[in-house]
Amino acid sequence: MNRASALLFLALLTCTKGERATNVPKDSIQSRAPEPAALVAPDSFSTGGPLDEIPSLLAGFDSQAGAARQQARAVAATPAADSVFLSFRERFLKMGEQITDRLEQATSIQATVLEDTATSRQLTTLLAKDGFALAYTEGNAYADEDNAYWTRLFDGALTPAMQRYLRLRATEQSRRFSEDAALQISWDELAGRAVTWEQFADSYPDFSWKDASRFWYNTYLSTYLTGMDNSRVFSDSGTLEPEVRASYEHLVAQYPQTRTAQLVAQCLTLLKQNGYRPSAAIDSLLQQHNVTSMLGVQPPTR
């Protein structure tokens, strides 16, 4: 995923109230950010390049985060508290863009600057203190959003629905979802994510950030039923991949009462009728349920 695509995801989920991805070596997966008490962030860098500007960009940002937390706690567990969080998150994402700009500039000028272990560790620590994860995809570095940070910062301040949303996303973020349009989790785990977000929607029908939860459900369901460019549901010969078929059958047996499983069951019926090959009937069924193809689409990485 290139930087433009990555920024689009975060912008999409901000404007419609959803999530961000942006874009150092390929297939590198970030560990969870350390707990705040364990962080000893550097006051400055001396790389002689754009990275040296990042500490000054973040100066005072933790105070802004603390103020937002206090403001949310003053109206704890209400929609107003969620609004405080979402408003601060918009500022957070704009800061992330500025940091990502510096990372992009630094690696274009000093190609190996982030290969220095000490610099990379210091930068990871500095970003983690303010809720950013130093993440990589397809050779590009970016400042990603750490949802686990939000759960700590706004612990006890948000509505149950928002707290649940952030916990779910923090858990999902700990496992890379895709890289280079190839699925990084199993088909069964992908199905489980779709079911989880369906259950979330049922449990919290009045969730104030529905566009975000809907985005994740649609992304997982669409990927499950249409695949990705480098993780296809149909083989080169045109038949359903055996592991995908096994996952579909497992989902239908495990969660028969869910809308997700019921749709998959209908797909299986149509597939069986056509020798487990794609058909116009399946395309029509998916269209009726607003399932769009993920082929030719850059999926989120985390």
Which residues does each PLM region occupy?
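Bacterial signal peptide processing site
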Residues: 16-19
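A cross-kingdom marker for long, charged
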Residues: 222-223, 234-302
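Soluble non-cytosolic domains of exported or imported proteins
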Residues: 180-191, 204-211, 238-242, 258
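N-terminal Sec/ER secretory leader and immediately downstream segment
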Residues: 32-146
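Amphipathic alpha-helices of TPR/Sel1-like and other helical repeat/solenoid scaffolds
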Residues: 190-203, 244-251
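Short solvent-exposed coil/turn linkers within tandem alpha-helical repeat scaffolds
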Residues: 152-160, 200-212, 251-262
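Sec-dependent bacterial lipoprotein signal peptides
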Residues: 1-13
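Short coil/turn linking the two alpha-helices of tandem helical-hairpin repeats
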Residues: 97-100, 111-114, 121, 131-134, ...
